[in-house]
Amino acid sequence: MIQKNTLLEVADNSGARAVLCIGLLGGRKSASVGDTIIISTKSINPKGKVEKGKVYKAVVVRVKNSVKKSDGSVIRFSSNAVVLINDQGEPLGTRVFGPVKKLLSGSFMKIMSLADEVL
């Protein structure tokens, strides 16, 4: 579960390393895998596409909290991670690192195709 003021890792090569959740879209109190959130970059790679302190949108791809699959099994990741997206919902980076939970929304198919492993 991702709430406001949650520190998250970035799972793509957009240039951001760590981000802070500053808002949730849809009027929710918490976000899970596949939800879109508003983030602020806290630490960056100097050669990246993003700037420190700027506000971006991101989609949650991994959460520490257990997520049940349709067959009854449970998936739990070791970190909370996001992929930065633009206003059209396309990822800012060209690669996605680490495993990604299957995103049910059809608008994030590009993220699933860039991922190494989809669970």
From Swiss-Prot:
Q: Does the keyword Cell membrane apply?
A: no
Keywords attached to this entry: Ribonucleoprotein, Ribosomal protein, RNA-binding, rRNA-binding
| Biological process per Gene Ontology, one example term | translation
One GO MF annotation is: large ribosomal subunit rRNA binding
Q: Any keyword Cytoplasm?
A: no
Top-level division of the source organism's lineage: Bacteria
Q: Which GO terms describe its cellular component?
A: cytosolic large ribosomal subunit
The UniProt function text for this chain reads: Binds to 23S rRNA. Forms part of two intersubunit bridges in the 70S ribosome.
Assembly and binders: Part of the 50S ribosomal subunit. Forms a cluster with proteins L3 and L19. In the 70S ribosome, L14 and L19 interact and together make contacts with the 16S rRNA in bridges B5 and B8.
Q: What family does the entry list? A: Belongs to the universal ribosomal protein uL14 family.
- Identify this protein by name: Large ribosomal subunit protein uL14
Q: Please name the taxonomic classification of the source.
A: Bacteria, Pseudomonadati, Pseudomonadota, Alphaproteobacteria, Rickettsiales
This chain is encoded by the gene named rplN
